[in-house]
């Protein structure tokens, strides 16, 4: 089980900033689950995290959110 960060209702770019801060707290290779609203957050946050070099995988979609798994890279 890995930590979960619920960012539903958080606007861009704050949801990306909060995700990055949480990633800074975990070790390289560790995982973080992030819940994001559909729309812009669902598109922008994973894209930005991938550009930072992290591995991002969509775990599933809820009625009002998407769940992603982020593996921290160095």
Where are these regions (language model features)?
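Compositionally biased, disordered extreme N-termini, encompassing classical targeting presequences
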Residues: 1-2, 74
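Amphipathic, hydrophobic secondary-structure cores in small proteins
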Residues: 6-58
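C-terminal edge-of-domain segments
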Residues: 57-74
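Intrinsic-disorder/low-complexity, polar/charged segments enriched in Ser/Thr/Lys/Arg/Asp/Glu/Gln
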Residues: 1, 29-33, 65-67
